[in-house]
Regions:
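Extracellular ligand-binding/catalytic regions of CAZymes and related secreted enzymes
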Residues: 123-155
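An acidic, glycine-rich "communication" segment
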Residues: 33-125, 142
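Acidic side chains
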Residues: 27-28, 119, 147
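Residue-level detector of short, conserved catalytic/binding motifs and their immediate flanks
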Residues: 22, 111, 146
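Solvent-exposed, flexible loop/coil residues
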Residues: 10, 60, 146
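Short, low-complexity, polar/charged sequence segments that are solvent-exposed and flexible
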Residues: 15-18, 44-46, 72-75, 130-135
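A generic secondary-structure signal for well-formed alpha-helical elements
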Residues: 22, 46-50, 152
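Helical hinge/lid and interdomain linker segments adjacent to catalytic or ligand-binding clefts
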Residues: 1-39, 44, 79-83, 115
Length: 155
């Protein structure tokens, strides 16, 4: 996500989609460079003065839509996990802490969810490739994924 660049037309289409009830989940972008690049792009769609980015704290309902999520897990890509001997932070100290953030509309409806410094979707994509990766990451990855998707569909 850190390399996303929206055209003027995409900015207008995405803003209209989100303002009409749409939901966007952004996952798998790591470190401050990718975060800053993403913030720059999403700010063209949803100006931060009107739509600030906020941390989703553990009292937010998204943490318990279907499953109780204690905290956002840090899930690496399977290739990084293998190369690094089981490390989870793909940018080392620059991405040591995963973040669960969101952007809400003026009524408090969550429009954008961002899972930064983690790759939740890799927990679903790679389950058949390595049994240990599956055991380490898929249960929590599926729990987060289902909570986010169900929250987006029901709010």
């Amino acid at each position: 996500m850190g390399t996303a660049e929206f055209s003027d037309a995409e900015v207008e289409i995405l803003r209209a989609y989100l303002e009409k009830g749409g939901f966007l989940w952004v996952d798998d972008f790591w470190g401050p460079y990718a975060w800053d690049a993403w913030v720059e792009q999403i700010s063209t769609v949803l100006p931060p003065g009107e739509y600030p980015i906020r941390d989703l704290t553990q009292d937010h309902p998204i943490y318990r839509t279907l499953f109780e999520i204690g905290e956002l897990p840090q899930i690496p890509s399977i290739s990084f996990w293998r190369r690094s001997g089981g490390q989870t932070s793909e940018r080392r100290e620059l991405s040591a802490e995963p973040h669960f953030r969101g952007i809400s509309d003026e009524h408090g409806r969550l429009m954008v969810v961002m899972t930064h410094n983690t790759d939740i979707s890799d927990a679903w994509e790679r389950e058949g490739e390595d049994p240990q990766f599956f055991l380490n990451f898929s249960p929590n990855g599926y729990a987060v994924g289902l909570d986010v998707v169900l929250y987006g569909m029901t709010h």
